[in-house]
UniProtKB/Swiss-Prot annotation:
EC number: 4.3.3.6, 3.5.1.2
Originating organism: Mycobacterium avium (strain 104)
Self-association and partners: In the presence of PdxS, forms a dodecamer of heterodimers. Only shows activity in the heterodimer.
InterPro entries: Class_I_gatase-like, PdxT/SNO, PdxT/SNO_CS
Pathway the protein takes part in: Cofactor biosynthesis; pyridoxal 5'-phosphate biosynthesis
Keyword Lyase part of the UniProt annotation: yes
Function according to Swiss-Prot or TrEMBL: Catalyzes the hydrolysis of glutamine to glutamate and ammonia as part of the biosynthesis of pyridoxal 5'-phosphate. The resulting ammonia molecule is channeled to the active site of PdxS.
Molecular-function GO term, any one: glutaminase activity
SUPFAM superfamilies, alphabetized: Class I glutamine amidotransferase-like
GO biological process terms, semicolon-separated: glutamine catabolic process; pyridoxal phosphate biosynthetic process; pyridoxine metabolic process
Entry protein name: Pyridoxal 5'-phosphate synthase subunit PdxT
Length: 198
């Protein structure tokens, strides 16, 4: 079987780190900035960044509705931090003044932006992750958390009593940044979701 082609939405965030992590996890990876690139991938990573800015870049580049359509048609997706926020069906504290974060509605969950606090409240720690024997080193930067996980959404990890990782079908989301550590198990899990191994 050939390696899946997985795109990384390259509007903001740790694009290079995600591209490298996906390659190390066995995928062919490519940056995605245009509709044609979006339509050429088997799966998509939405990295961290600023969710309101990313939403409006998607809109300005005419990617928002095509991406929503591809997700509705079943495109596998993984969102980290701001990516988790965007994959949600509902966003709390989404922003104001016409600059709100816009939900892609790919995972049936309600996510609260910046739930763990501001930049100064960023932290890291080891957390248990469903299906993995050894805890994951999780880096949280102005991280969200999941306030509601819908039916069919599997909770994969918690931190400080809050849900910070979920899966729904071939959709994965984490409130933390696995690309910032050398641990490739989260990216490998997403590659397996794209190829249908899990």
């Amino acid at each position: 079987m050939s390696a899946p082609r997985i795109g990384v939405l390259a509007l903001q965030g740790d694009t290079r780190e995600h591209l490298a992590a996906l390659r190390e996890a066995g995928a062919e990876s490519m940056p995605v900035r245009r509709r044609g690139e979006l339509e050429a991938v088997d799966g998509l990573v939405i990295p961290g960044g600023e969710s309101t800015t990313m939403s409006h870049l998607l809109k300005d580049l005419d990617l928002l509705e095509p991406l929503r359509g591809l997700l509705a048609d079943g495109l596998p997706a993984y969102g980290a931090c701001a990516g988790m926020i965007l994959l949600a069906s509902e966003i709390l504290d989404a922003g104001a003044g016409g600059r709100e974060a816009l939900p892609l509605r790919a995972i049936d969950m309600t996510v609260r932006r910046n739930a763990f606090g501001r930049q100064v409240d960023s932290f890291e720690g080891d957390i248990a992750f469903a299906g993995l024997d050894v805890p994951v080193r999780a880096v949280f930067i102005r991280a969200p958390w999941v306030e509601r996980a819908g039916d069919g959404v599997e909770v994969l990890a918690r931190a400080a009593g809050h849900v910070v990782a979920v899966r729904q079908g071939a959709r994965l989301a984490t409130a933390f940044h696995p690309e910032m550590t050398g641990d490739r198990r989260i990216h490998r899990l997403f590659v397996d979701l794209v190829t249908g191994v899990v």
